[in-house]
From Swiss-Prot:
Positions of disulphide bridges: 40-54, 40-81, 53-66, 84-91
MF GO annotations: ion channel regulator activity; toxin activity
Localization per Swiss-Prot or TrEMBL: Secreted
Domain note: The presence of a 'disulfide through disulfide knot' structurally defines this protein as a knottin.
Gene Ontology, cellular component aspect: extracellular region
InterPro entries in the record: Cys_Knot_tox
Leader sequence segment: 1-16
Keywords: Disulfide bond, Ion channel impairing toxin, Knottin, Neurotoxin, Secreted, Signal, Toxin
Protein source organism: Chilobrachys guangxiensis (Chinese earth tiger tarantula)
Name of the protein described by the UniProt record: U36-theraphotoxin-Cg1a
Family: Belongs to the neurotoxin 27 (Jztx-72) family. ICK-72 subfamily.
Keyword Aminoacyl-tRNA synthetase appears in the UniProt entry: no
Tissue distribution: Expressed by the venom gland.
Length: 93
């Protein structure tokens, strides 16, 4: 019983010190049809303009953008859709 109590106290101290990380990679987005008949591009998909990217449901705290990123082959940067947090400037990739 004493061991269980020590583990519980240790876990509480670790959470208090480190905090709980927020997962910014799972921002909900609105998957809609574009005027040209195609559907919007999900985050991490290659894009040409921001209008092609799916917009987040929460447009007050988040925004969608099309920006440069290194692809897996790392030969040259390409444009990919992102959903970013307004306050923390963290974007999904």
């Amino acid at each position: 019983m004493k061991t269980v109590l020590h583990i519980a106290i240790f876990s509480a101290v670790v959470v208090a010190i480190c905090g709980v990380r927020q997962n910014y990679g799972n921002v909900r987005y609105n998957y809609t049809e574009l005027p040209n008949g195609e559907y919007c591009y999900i985050p991490r998909r290659r894009c040409d303009t921001t209008e092609q990217c799916c917009k987040p449901y929460d447009t007050i705290n988040n925004f969608a953008a099309c920006g440069k990123a290194w692809p897996e082959d790392k030969k040259r940067k390409v444009n990919k859709c992102y959903i970013c947090d307004n306050e923390l400037t963290l974007c999904t990739r």
